[in-house]
């Protein structure tokens, strides 16, 4: 789900068919809003899709995205990204996190939620030397009914009328209350809780949420 704070969103999410056994899931947030952010995000989408074809290393894809976008990103802008490659046969996820909010892993067997927090640098800050060294692949396996939740900071930093943030505790509470309903249930519950929390207060940031569930 994507709920833009303005008519033009600075968040980006995508589903990419890599080959018959693999697909890619991307989520990103560009610093800044409006048309400039959307232009950078359109470039990001184009480069990501061109590099994803046939590539099973999420880190390699983001390293190429950074290399191609770095010359065009202003000094006051950057892109936080997470890119996950799903192997349909082995239920393995290869994840790379480029300065993005840590994805959440829900384990159905024991009803626990942990942050998946591998190191990584946001796109557009470094030309490649440091970025390529610190931005690496991280692998995890999903079991039946496990969920991987990707989100932008518009979720945790949503503000109520008093200026208080929604926060990670409320995110986790919403997930635990709805995980038995699957990916759609988590998205519905979390979106409803966010709207109830924010109320009539103007939304100050884009909100994007992706839930991947292993059947």
Regions found by a protein language model. Name each.
Residues 62, 82, 138-150, 155-215:
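C-terminal catalytic subdomain
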Residues 1-149, 201-215:
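… and, occasionally, acidic/histidine-rich disordered N-termini of signaling adaptors
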């Amino acid at each position: 789900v994507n709920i833009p704070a303005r008519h033009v969103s600075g968040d980006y999410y995508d589903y990419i068919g890599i080959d018959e056994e693999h697909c890619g899931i991307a989520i990103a947030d560009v610093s800044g809003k409006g048309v400039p952010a959307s232009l950078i995000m359109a470039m990001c989408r184009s480069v990501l899709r061109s590099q994803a074809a046939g590539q099973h290393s999420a880190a390699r894809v983001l390293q190429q995205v950074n290399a191609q976008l770095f010359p065009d990103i202003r000094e006051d802008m950057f892109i936080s990204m997470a890119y996950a490659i799903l192997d349909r046969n082995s239920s393995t996820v290869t994840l790379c996190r480029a300065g993005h909010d840590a994805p959440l892993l829900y384990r159905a067997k024991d009803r626990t939620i942990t942050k998946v927090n591998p190191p990584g640098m946001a796109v557009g800050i470094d030309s490649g030397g440091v970025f390529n060294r610190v931005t690496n692949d991280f692998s995890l396996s999903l079991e039946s009914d496990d969920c991987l939740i990707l989100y932008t900071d518009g979720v945790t930093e949503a503000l109520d009328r008093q200026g208080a943030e929604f926060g990670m505790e409320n995110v986790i509470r919403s997930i635990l209350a709805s995980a038995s309903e699957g990916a759609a249930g988590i998205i519905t519950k979390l979106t409803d809780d966010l709207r109830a929390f924010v109320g009539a207060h103007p939304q100050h940031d884009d909100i994007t949420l992706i839930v991947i569930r292993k059947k």
